[in-house]
Amino acid sequence: MTLDEIYESFIWDASYTNEEYESKITIGINEAKKYKYLYPFIQPVIPEKSKCIWEPCARVIALKSDEELKPYLYLLFEWLQDLNWPGAYVIFDRLLKMPFSLLEDVLNHCKRQAKKENDELWLMALEDFSKQINL
């Protein structure tokens, strides 16, 4: 399956029942798991359909090991800039499962960046994440 076909499998259509759609994206997720690099699944931008595929893309990312996610941590924390974005909570929950020692530097960098940009939503999400990971 090509990347375009995977993206197509993630697009929801009103003609699908929930079961049909879940079956369709499961096929895409299983194909996407074969990809070594995660960039194509981190908030991909495709004309007119970008955000509708973010949730399944987040599910692909959540299946990866901590080691596989390490190079992408900054981008994954950026996904938390708006917790209303599709897939944000999938990423949030996956990051919570990682050892804090792996996340600490990137998390602190993102907090500084959010403050610098006056991005209150992102900062709130990062503070909430910090509270939950330290429980």
Residue ranges of model-derived segments:
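Amphipathic alpha-helical scaffolding segments comprising HEAT/armadillo-like alpha-solenoid repeats
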Residues: 1-12, 34-46, 66-78, 100-112, ...
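Alpha-solenoid helical repeat architecture
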Residues: 10-19, 45-50, 61, 76, ...
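Structural detector for internal amphipathic alpha-helices that build alpha-solenoid repeat scaffolds
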Residues: 20-34, 54-67, 78-82, 86-98, ...
